[in-house]
Amino acid sequence: MNQSVIDAVLRGRIPRKIGARRVRALRDSIDFVGLNYYNREFVAFDRHARQAFFGRRVQNPDGEISDKNYGEVYPRGLYRILRRLKRSGKPIYITENGLPDHDDDRRPAFLVNHLKQMWHAINENVPVMGYYHWTLTDNYEWAEGWNLRFGLVELDPKTQRRSLRRSGALYAEVCKANALDTDMVRRYAPELMETVFRG
């Protein structure tokens, strides 16, 4: 199913696995590709999990898991999917990328690592035209309520008071400079200095 929608809107072709047919009106019907990328998950077949399309989540024992077991933090996956989407021939916007991080301890490194992967893709002529972090402020999630904190800006649900987080300050600097530089990484994610800027 991974390529089914993109194949349909680019080529007007619905794959055999979901009922092969051609739909000419769909062919080349998009102006850009919007990518929402959050994490990596492994699944295994489970014949008892009908409601989950017979799949069961399997955790990577070596992976970094985000708050509330939201998924494995895997920045390289962003690069890999951007390279794959390059074949669409369309401009690409990363329309959502983020993780729940109640205390904003990991979000600065998450941002740095994902922006680095986006930069690698751009340097390989992947037409990435924009990046939107998920989210600007903490928001109410349908299944989780206020329990997952995704925002660059902390939101108190009772008072509606907003406070800029460290990750928000980092992202503001990145946007203003249209770059991620050594000073930003040193101040916001110093543990990544040697891996982000090698040599």
Task: Give the label of every model feature segment.
Residues 1-199:
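Active-site region of glycoside hydrolase catalytic domains
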